[in-house]
Amino acid sequence: MVAERAGHQWCLFLDRDGVINRQVVGDYVRNWRQFEWLPGAARALKKLRAWAPYIVVVTNQQGVGAGLMSAVDVMVIHRHLQMQLASDGVLIDGFQVCPHHRSQRCGCRKPRPGLVLDWLGRHPDSEPLLSIVVGDSLSDLELAHNVAAAAGACASVQIGGASSGGVADASFDSLWEFAVAVGHARGERG
C-alpha cells in the first residue's frame, strides 16, 4: 500500500465515530457515558501501535458548532479514551478536532485536509507518503485524496460494510480486521 522511507515515520490518521466507537444514531457522542467502543477497536489500536509510530484521531465534531456540546466536552471524551488505552499501554499521539458546523466554511472540516496537514506540518518526521487515513465515510476517503493532492500521497482504508465505490485503497469490516491484515503483512502470526 505504501513504501518505507528511511528517516521518516508512518502516520495513521483515524476517524473516531464509526471506526473506534459506535455512532449515536441521529445525535452526537456528547459525553463519555455515550461513548461505546466498537468490538475489537481498543485491541486493534494496541496492535496498530506496534507498527505505527504515530496514531492520530481526526474527527469532525459539528455538535460543538451547533451548540449541542462544548469543545471541553469533546476534550473530556478524548481524555477518557486516552486514559483507558493508556492502562493497556497504548498512546494516541493526537486528537485533531474540527468543531465547526458543516455550514461554516473552515479549512479543517473533513474532507478538507487542514487537520492532517496541520499535524504533518508540526511533525516534520511524519511523512505524507507513509500516511494512511482510516475512516467509515466518504468524507474520510476524500480526506485521504485531498491530503494526497496537497502533500504528494496518502493511502485510504475504509472501515465498515458500505461500498466506497472503489474510492478506498483497501476496505475492511472493522478496525480489528485492518489491524490483523497489517499484522499479517508484517509477518505476524495469529
From Swiss-Prot:
Query: What subunit structure does UniProt give?
Result: Monomer.
Q: Where does Mg(2+) bind?
A: D15, D17, D136
Q: Which organism is it from?
A: Mycobacterium tuberculosis (strain ATCC 25618 / H37Rv)
Question: Which pathway?
Answer: Nucleotide-sugar biosynthesis; GDP-D-glycero-alpha-D-manno-heptose biosynthesis; GDP-D-glycero-alpha-D-manno-heptose from D-glycero-alpha-D-manno-heptose 7-phosphate: step 2/3
Any GO BP: carbohydrate metabolic process
Q: Which GO terms describe its molecular function?
A: D-glycero-beta-D-manno-heptose 1,7-bisphosphate 7-phosphatase activity; magnesium ion binding; zinc ion binding
Protein family per UniProt:
Belongs to the GmhB family.
List the protein's name.
D-glycero-alpha-D-manno-heptose-1,7-bisphosphate 7-phosphatase
Give the positions the UniProt entry annotates as the active site: D15 (nucleophile), D17 (proton donor)
